[in-house]
Each structure stands twice: as C-alpha cells, then as structure tokens.
C-alpha cells in the first residue's frame, strides 16, 4: 500500500469525558465511570458538522492551535524546521552521496537546504516581531 498524509481543519474546545457524555458526544453505550468522567479531552466539530469527543493526548498529538496568524506562522516554522533538520542530517551523513548520483541534483539539495534555513530565519523574525 502507498502512504498518504492528510490534514483537516476542525474546531475544538476543552471538555471532560463526563461533559461529553452529558452532551451525547460519546459512542452509543459508552458510559464513563466516575474516574473516567474527569478525564480531560476535547469537544471536536468537523467541517461537515459531525461532533465528537477526543481524549487530550491523541488530540494534542494530531492537532495544533491555528487560531491566529501567529499560531499559523509558529506551526509553519516548526514543520519547516523539522524537514530542514532531516535534510541537513541526510546531506551531512554522506547518505546523499550514496543515493543521489549526479552532481546537479546534489547541488539542488544543498541549495534547498540553504533556502529552508533562510525561510526558517525569516519566519522566526516575523514571529518575534509579532510577539
């Protein structure tokens, strides 16, 4: 099978599992005991209007707050930085020489790495000016 990456935009607010149960957001037949009722999570509303509840840990791993332009810049900087670190490690490890055969593509990868670094610096400057 092939790999796919998907992203979706949602609305969410903090909510306990007990509150989610009271609002009918849990799976039918799922009744939390007193301990689980206190468990923190999020009330989630999808673009198609479907609403559900998600435990905090998987929600916070999958979603990042993107309410303001500053939030979105910080997400962009974090994502680009992650890709930059991987590319720089690939280039510096010598694996690039094993995988990429021609000098032109090696040069393009190095230019891409430099451009990503410059873009991260630009985003960081904009973020600092927005604080």
Question: Model-derived features: where do they sit?
Answer:
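Long amphipathic alpha-helical coiled-coil segments
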Residues: 125-131
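Motif-centric detector for short Cys/His coordination patterns
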Residues: 1-91, 108, 114-115, 121-125
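Acidic interhelical loop/turn segments
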Residues: 93-107
